[in-house]
């Protein structure tokens, strides 16, 4: 065996927090824009991802950055990296 670190392609995404009611968990809505294959109109599509928030630092409306990690639970395989922008409440 060689002592070489093999890094896989780590995915990083940005999104808004839509729920923080669970302990150490958040739900993040990630928006993307796609072009309709026939009509050519640009459409917004939203994906909701469950992520791990170790310190319960996020609030609803925060813009955050998450990265993919090993599965933490049945639905969580993303972890919070940083809070980009706090929500104005």
From Swiss-Prot:
Q: Output the SUPFAM superfamilies linked to this UniProt entry.
A: Nucleic acid-binding proteins
Supply the Gene3D superfamilies for this chain. Nucleic acid-binding proteins
Q: Which GO terms describe its biological process?
A: translation
PROSITE patterns (UniProt xref):
RIBOSOMAL_S17
UniProt entry tagged with the keyword rRNA-binding: yes
Q: Which GO CC annotations does the UniProt entry carry? A: cytosolic small ribosomal subunit
Any GO molecular function: rRNA binding
Q: Which CDD domains match?
A: Ribosomal_uS17
The entry assigns this protein to a family as follows:
Belongs to the universal ribosomal protein uS17 family.
- What protein name does the entry list? Small ribosomal subunit protein uS17
Specify the species.
Answer: Baumannia cicadellinicola subsp. Homalodisca coagulata
């Amino acid at each position: 065996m060689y002592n070489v670190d093999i890094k896989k392609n780590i995915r990083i995404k940005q999104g808004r927090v839509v729920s923080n009611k669970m302990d150490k968990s958040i739900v993040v809505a990630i928006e993307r824009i796609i072009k309709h294959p026939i009509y050519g109109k640009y459409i917004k599509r939203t994906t909701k991802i469950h992520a791990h928030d170790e310190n319960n630092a996020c609030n609803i409306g925060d813009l955050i950055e998450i990265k993919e990690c090993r599965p933490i639970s049945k639905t969580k395989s993303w972890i919070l990296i940083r809070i980009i922008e706090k929500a104005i409440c």
